């Protein structure tokens, strides 16, 4: 598992923390993926999934049709969130440039997302 340490910014990059099995208590958590075209649909489904018992959700940023507003997606979130933005070559819907995809994911880190998933 890889986590970014938001508290330690080195140059233009965040320090990357690599967590091994020896560092954490092993347990299983199912992460439910949300791929919807509108922010309000993602937010509503996130709330619904948590009400049904989900403990972790993945928000697929590549499904959102308009400009992604990270603060809106992360505000008052009812559970930890994994954000990802899949390229088409990885089975996703991202049509922008690779540079813009990385900028979006870095912005998610700055906005306080719990986890980032990269292919």
Task: Locate predicted features.
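Short, acidic/polar
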Residues: 37-50, 96-107
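Short, small-residue-enriched loops and turns at beta-alpha junctions
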Residues: 37-40, 63-66, 88-96
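A common structural microfeature
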Residues: 29, 54-58, 80-82
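N-terminal-biased segments
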Residues: 2-10, 50-68
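N-terminal amphipathic alpha-helix/helix-capping segment at the start of soluble metabolic enzymes
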Residues: 2-44
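Glycine/small-residue-rich loop that forms an oxyanion/phosphate-binding "nest" at active or ligand-binding sites
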Residues: 74, 81-119
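Acidic (Asp/Glu)-rich catalytic clusters
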Residues: 21-24, 46-51, 67-81, 106-111
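Catalytic beta/alpha-barrel core
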Residues: 33-35, 56-64, 105, 111-119
């Amino acid at each position: 598992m890889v986590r970014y340490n938001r508290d330690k910014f080195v140059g233009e990059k965040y320090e990357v923390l690599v967590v091994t099995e020896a560092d954490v208590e092993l347990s299983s958590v199912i992460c439910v993926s949300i791929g919807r075209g509108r922010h309000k649909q993602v937010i509503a489904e996130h709330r619904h999934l948590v009400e049904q018992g989900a403990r972790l959700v993945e928000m697929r940023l590549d499904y959102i049709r308009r400009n992604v507003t990270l603060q809106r997606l992360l505000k008052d979130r009812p559970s930890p969130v994994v954000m990802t933005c899949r390229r088409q070559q990885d089975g996703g819907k991202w049509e922008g440039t690779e540079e813009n995809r990385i900028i979006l994911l870095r912005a998610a880190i700055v906005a306080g997302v719990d986890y980032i998933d990269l292919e």
